Amino acid sequence: MRSHYCGALNRSHIGQQVILSGWVHKRRDLGGLIFIDMRDREGIVQVCFDPKYQEALTEASALRNEFCIKIEGEVIARPDNQINKNMATGEVEVVAKALSVYNVSDVLPLDFNQNNTEEQRLKYRYLDLRRPEMAQHLKTRAKITAFVRRYMDENGFLDIETPMLTKATPEGARDYLVPSRVHKGKFYALPQSPQLFKQLLMMSGFDRYYQIVKCFRDEDLRADRQPEFTQIDVETSFMTAPEVREIMEKMVHGLWLNTIGVDLGKFPTMTWQEAMERFGSDKPDLRNPLEIVDVADIVKDIDFNVFSDPANSSNGRVAVIRVPNGINITRKQIDEYTQFVGIYGAKGLAWVKINDINAGLEGVQSPIAKFLTTEKIKAIFDRTSAQSGDILFFGADKWQTATDAMGALRLKLGRDLGLTHLDEWKPLWVIDFPMFERDEEGNLAAMHHPFTSPKDFTPEQLEANPTSAVANAYDMVINGYEVGGGSVRIFDPKMQQTVFHILGIDEDQQREKFGFLLDALKFGTPPHAGLAFGLDRLTMLLTGTDNIRDVIAFPKTTAAACLMTDAPSLANEKALEELAIKTIM
């Protein structure tokens, strides 16, 4: 039914007889001639019907867009004045000798020549995927997974499947629950990750494991999140954190080179503390040259409580972003930026425009100038490397609030002012995260997950001072996206019980939820570490789209619904009865 793909034809095929199968992309009737653009998954080629093959020409008059057809014909060179440099096949065309119509098409509910709403695209996803750009996204995804499998196989990793129906464990998000018909009143959980199973595989002696695996999280969705997503999941025994990072960095380096021909170079490493202080984010976008600078020590004794109060607080921060040549930012824009940081809890946004850096206070324009002395403003200029023509934005609040607000402002300024180098790739590793953080109720929670090992802490030291512990964890960040994260795991049962205890999981709950893990840790568990990459997010970056749904064949909406199949749907009453479940709505 096919000898070649449409999009694969080129000058080397001139003179060859070919059989093509695909769809009518466009049709043009020029009187005595009919041209169509014929499309398959590999691309588009122009097909010409001319009077030499009258039967095919007559049949072609009935063709319409999206008819599914077969063409038999000869590849010829296009005349020089008809070469289309915008098409991969633009130097050739196919003269059709025979035409078969596999199937006709109704008028499409989507218009491929216009921008359709995302709702329309998701409802008719099978048609949306016919678009060349969508087909290219899925081909890139397949290329990525093929490369990953090759790399992992070459480096001695075993592809081992782990269960989909498993036990609910606290991993930071709600589980999708599956009721058991056999064990009435009991539920399986769909895995948020294969975390515990891959650790158990290390205990079983499979020292290099990987899996490209579906995971599930019932959480509030964002543009780059889905309720079901795919991980490249990795675990190793007898490897240190730097060794794990090295082998995974080589994989990602090769992936970029193989997929888009980009050399990412050596990945720099930065601590979580440095990333937060300099960039206001634990996944900094290093394409943006703006940085956050602390000035609390300079302003702690000025007569301006907005600055001096957080500057003198152990939990406060006063920070500055210098925008080079930002003096022309208008008051209206400043007001908009003030509203913007308010989204992150900031109470305001102070600013200083520098007209003449050599004139001290006389050379600045600012509503806070009256609270500053010549010495203070000079110290701030020196700290921020300010120049005439710059503007300084100040954030002052609790440390986390000021950091989050200034980090978000940094990104917005970079986008708005064209400072972020969108044509660059800036990868890095972020390491040494806090072991614990406070949740909304003020309780300690694991920043990564409760199986992450602390750095250089005994169980006794961790119990005594948990908030000072640093996790032996690491995230890979590319252009402001966390593409992968992992850690060295706890392999000592006493340390694991200590972490559970700090998290408020008592001994009875430990046995109920994690008894199998605690038992396994007693039998000669090796030191082990791992990492997981988000395949969807990697593909999103490598295809250049900003919407993760563009790289998943059949994604869900932000409301976790499938518009095409109308899932989720009401369950059959008899099925619910067999499961001993009653719905209350």
Swiss-Prot record:
Main location per the UniProt record: cytoplasm
Listed EC numbers: 6.1.1.12
Recorded superkingdom: Bacteria
Disulphide connectivity of cysteines: none
Keyword Protein biosynthesis in record: yes
Gene Ontology CC: one annotated term: cytoplasm
Pfam family, one: tRNA-synt_2
SUPFAM superfamilies: Class II aaRS and biotin synthetases, GAD domain-like, Nucleic acid-binding proteins
GO molecular function: aspartate-tRNA ligase activity; ATP binding; nucleic acid binding
Chain residues that bind L-aspartate: E171, R217, H448, R489
Subunit structure, as described in the record: Homodimer.
Family: Belongs to the class-II aminoacyl-tRNA synthetase family. Type 1 subfamily.
Cited NCBIfam families: aspS_bact, PRK00476.1
Protein name in UniProt: Aspartate--tRNA ligase
Organism, as annotated: Histophilus somni (strain 129Pt)
